[in-house]
Amino acid sequence: AGIRRGIEKEGLRVLPTGGLALTPHPLALGSALTHPLITTDYSESQLELITGAHKGVQQCLDELTEVHQFVHHTLKDSGGELLWASSMPCGLPTDETIPLARYGSSNIGRAKSVYRMGLGHRYGRRMQTISGIHYNWSLPGVTSEQYFSLIRNFRRHAFVLLYLFGASPALCPCFVEGREHRLQRMEGGSALYLPHATSLRMGRLGYQSDAQATLAVSYNGLTGYANSLHEALTKPYPAYEALGIRNPGGDYNQLGTSLLQIENEF
């Protein structure tokens, strides 16, 4: 009793043919910078639908359904685009063709776009098109120490949860183009899969970072957690220093040269 929860659901806008829609964020969906319920994630083609905080599960799902239906009808009426249902992305163009989300010319809008430019340089734009659901929740009367105990337990059993509930066993060949993989081609189609895979999204081909794997983040308490992230946010990382903050033309490559540009990158 007393639990409050909210959902953030990401999804790619796609053409009826299954390819990524390269059109700007639809005007009919409002401003991606300021709309409280509908925004974009990494790409201009990647919608993020947001609910408020709810005490009841059904109320939360009902709001998400209403927002989802509004977006679906808006896309249908303004060009016939669809929302891709899977976590692993649809057919993608070349990496540099995937459009970054745009938020206008204000300082905060430009910072958000530069941050995404940095993500593209660091991890590749294709990886950033992986979509998912963020389930946000809070318990009444729970201390920071108790939250960290819960985090440690979740991380301890995460492999079992992915095995039981993972739902990304296949992907489009374009996602791993030019990369070494051991995936098999599905009979009668072009999709790649592994027979007993449950979550390619969370495997080595999915949403992973070798650079962040070097982070020694402490989950023993708030102070240790904050200190370990502070170092990642302030200490220069050689590979990102070599990339530089600006390119020769003066445009920004990234927000900074540390392992994490901002906290959200972790």
Features from the language model and the residues they span:
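Loop-rich catalytic cores of soluble enzymes, especially ATP-dependent carboxylate-amine ligases
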Residues: 101-106, 110-122, 138-266
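Terminal catalytic/cofactor-binding subdomain
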Residues: 1-120, 127-129, 146-152, 156-162, ...
